[in-house]
Amino acid sequence: MNASEFRRRGKEMVDYVADYLEGIEGRQVFPDVDPGYLRPLIPTTAPQEPETFEAIIEDIEKIIMPGVTHWHSPYFFAYFPTASSYPAMLADMLCGAIGCIGFSWAASPACTELETVMMDWLGKMLQLPEAFLAGEAGEGGGVIQGTASEATLVALLAARTKVTRHLQAASPELMQAAIMEKLVAYASDQAHSSVEKAGLIGGVRLKAIPSDGKFAMRASALQEALERDKAAGLIPFFVVATLGTTSCCSFDNLLEVGPICHEEGLWLHVDAAYAGSAFICPEFRHLLNGVEFADSFNFNPHKWLLVNFDCSAMWVKKRTDLTGAFRLDPVYLRHSHQDSGLITDYRHWQLPLGRRFRSLKMWFVFRMYGVKGLQAYIRKHVQLSHAFEALVRQDTRFEICAEVILGLVCFRLKGSNKLNEALLESINSAKKIHLVPCSLRDRFVLRFAICSRTVELAHVQLAWEHIQEMAATVLRAQGEEKAEIKN
């Protein structure tokens, strides 16, 4: 493909993408395929001779689209949103065209410097404490990670290195292995599974702190665990506080947990993967109060801030905590400015070496939407979730299972887990809408997350009517089953 054909095909692809997104409401949200459907439809080996663009596009509709779950359908209410916007897509095209691998300032100065500035822009939108911003001479700063899972792992590994070096400096005879076997990290029992995975990868034990009646980690439960473990000769070193849990969007009490971490000298990492986007709205900023106690903070613009995947924003108060843990300088990566103190080499802030020019997406989206446009988008989703909550509360067969704060509603039929499992199965089998469940205190709960950029109140109302219809069918079947047993 030469430049001339690329121009033509590029325009065709833009039309295809625009048509797909404009018509996505008409596509079934969840596919009608079985595991392994695709392999028989594709040759077992790559073609020896070039194929045409037309043939590939034809196969997209014939082979790929039938197996796609349409995350951007206005009838997709599962998981949490994955962001998408036209400005972000255009920026991603440019990122692919430039094709730099920005592991150091010298590898692509614009890639590095735009990321630093965009992370400061975003930090100011969130009203983060000044200590988290790079500024012109700050000790902190932001970095784009691939996912919140990566950010948590990076924070844990940096904290592990920091505490190990501190203990060895005080007692040089201590071996790293002896320290490692005593290290303990903590998170709420509602924390994301990636926190547990970080502990597994980091080789440290992770303890779940029981959450309160609102599914939040509180000071008393954390303090009790710390005292018990210290008395047993263990070494607490790392705490993850979650703002907006995956199960029910609950919020750990940062204003209680933060001071304890500060007093105990524990690294506090704040994971706000979903909820963090909402903090750009003044009315939701209070949910971030206490972040001043954190050593690191992370959220995903690629969830709810119209910047498509992958773009996970992470800030640290002391960049040397990261660079001290991950810095390696082989000859082939060195450059003349690396020790000048004037530049950032982001390879020392992350696990991989390579990195894409992801800040372009942020730059395009922030400029083309403006802060007010992004705030309006967040507020619309929150309004729709409360509209759905109101519909649920009007039907006495159902109950709300957790406080509705942002764009997620947790609800269920009053009754057994088996009944609610049957309801979810019937909803997803019909494939008009798509939901996923969670477990709250051993209760099977349905999650209704406002996800699509194009979702409107009418879609929410239609979804609720469908849920009611499925509920009536399930309840009727349950009644018939009970009648048969009785007879």
Curated annotation (Swiss-Prot):
GO terms for cellular component: cytoplasm. Residues 58-178 are annotated as: 2 X approximate tandem repeats. It catalyses: L-dopa + H(+) = dopamine + CO2; 5-hydroxy-L-tryptophan + H(+) = serotonin + CO2. Keywords: Acetylation, Catecholamine biosynthesis, Decarboxylase, Lyase, Pyridoxal phosphate, Repeat. Disulfide bonds: none annotated. InterPro entries: Aromatic_deC, PyrdxlP-dep_de-COase, PyrdxlP-dep_Trfase, PyrdxlP-dep_Trfase_major, PyrdxlP-dep_Trfase_small, Pyridoxal-P_BS. Pyridoxal 5'-phosphate binds at A148, S149, T246, N300. Its EC number is 4.1.1.28. Its cofactor is pyridoxal 5'-phosphate. This is Aromatic-L-amino-acid decarboxylase. The gene is DDC.
